[in-house]
């Protein structure tokens, strides 16, 4: 029997299908039962239990190259989970294989509270670029979120960095 769950990022609803464990791959089972699935489901208590048993899970990459913090920062309702991960040693500047940081993800998903939290926690690398040459400021302008743009600028983001298409962040404003 298929089970559907929904989550939202950047105004786009994702409809993932959960299928009986008989047909799930090991990667899917690991994700669903691990810290990443608990974060996607905003299950603070489960994340807390998992981290209590093994705090190194806060820096464990999934099979797609994402860390728990990448999932948590996508949605402001996970602000307490973001804080919990950071309190348990999550690397605030961790990068996916495509170079995206948690700050890239929070900016792209318009997660204002998580962006504020990341910046206030002392991100020192506000201008890390991803595989497209984009900084978090590029992502914020791309989404048209001026509140996040202004936050990034207040924390020293460089508005003159060019992405791979030779575009400054402001040129991506919708």
Curated annotation (Swiss-Prot):
Gene3D superfamilies per the UniProt record, alphabetical: Ankyrin repeat-containing domain
Q: Which UniProt keywords apply?
A: ANK repeat, Repeat
Supply the Pfam families for this chain: Ank_2 (PF12796)
Q: Does the keyword tRNA processing apply?
A: no
Q: Where are the ANK repeats?
A: 64-94, 98-128, 132-161
- Return the InterPro entries for the record: Ankyrin_rpt, Ankyrin_rpt-contain_sf
What SUPFAM superfamilies does the annotation carry? Ankyrin repeat
What does the sequence similarity comment in the record state about its family?
Belongs to the ANKRD39 family.
> What is this protein's record name?
Ankyrin repeat domain-containing protein 39 homolog
């Amino acid at each position: 029997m298929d089970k559907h769950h929904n989550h939202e990022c950047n105004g786009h609803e994702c409809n993932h299908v959960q299928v009986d464990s008989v047909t799930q791959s090991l990667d899917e089972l690991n994700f669903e039962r691990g810290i990443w699935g608990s974060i996607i489901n905003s299950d603070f208590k489960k994340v807390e239990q998992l981290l209590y048993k093994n705090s190194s899970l806060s820096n464990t990459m999934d099979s797609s190259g994402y860390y728990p913090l990448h999932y948590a920062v996508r949605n402001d309702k996970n602000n307490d989970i973001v804080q919990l991960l950071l309190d348990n040693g999550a690397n605030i500047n961790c990068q996916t294989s495509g170079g995206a940081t948690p700050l890239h993800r929070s900016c792209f998903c318009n997660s204002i509270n998580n962006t504020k939290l990341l910046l206030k926690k002392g991100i020192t690398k506000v201008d890390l670029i991803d595989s497209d040459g984009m900084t978090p400021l590029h992502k914020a302008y791309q989404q048209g979120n001026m509140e996040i743009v202004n936050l990034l600028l207040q924390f020293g983001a460089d508005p003159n960095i060019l992405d791979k298409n030779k575009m400054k962040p402001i040129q991506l404003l919708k």
